């Protein structure tokens, strides 16, 4: 944990340095995948454990509500982004964990929901969470699109994902913070494209 060794100024400086090293092309591809899912009417599933699990919930909430302006949220004619966090059905997760195995909690949901062309965003700081890997492996076999968010050395997730964004850093807290920080740019980019505003405004 970097905060044990670094004071506030050094910690913020380190965070700034790490952000500058991020693959910005991968950030754009991340947004592209989500926008394509919206265009094609596909579902987006987001999953992770612990802090990454709450990030999955946060991303799902933002993508569900904030890809359209609040002024049109009552307009039923507007096309919506179909997005679901697989971390939020506590009863289902507990039932699968208790009756089958904890490494099945995401893949069992995908078996019910997932279809070819849907997008799976898999978040794992270590890249080695068995329940995340099982879900990604299933998604790959069934022609879903898989995009991983990883830290440390990327683990196995970085090897099996179809695409992804990697934070090369051995500090879980900062990795999780960076994942969510970058997501907010992705959200803004997708919003701008769907609504033809900002950089995507019609000339």
Where would I find each of the regions flagged by the language model?
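A charged, well-structured terminal subsegment
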Residues: 112, 174-203
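Short, glycine/polar-rich helix-capping loops at beta-to-alpha or helix-loop-helix junctions
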Residues: 149-161
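Generic N-terminal amphipathic, Lys/Arg-enriched alpha-helix
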Residues: 1-22
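Glycine-centered short loops/turns at secondary-structure junctions
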Residues: 41-42, 117, 143
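Short beta->alpha connector loops at strand-helix junctions that form conserved
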Residues: 87, 124, 150, 165-173
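Short glycine/serine/threonine-rich phosphate/pyrophosphate-binding segments
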Residues: 52-57, 128-135, 157
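A short, well-structured juxtamembrane/interface segment
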Residues: 22-40
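Glycine-rich, small/polar surface segments that engage phosphate groups of diverse ligands
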Residues: 36-113
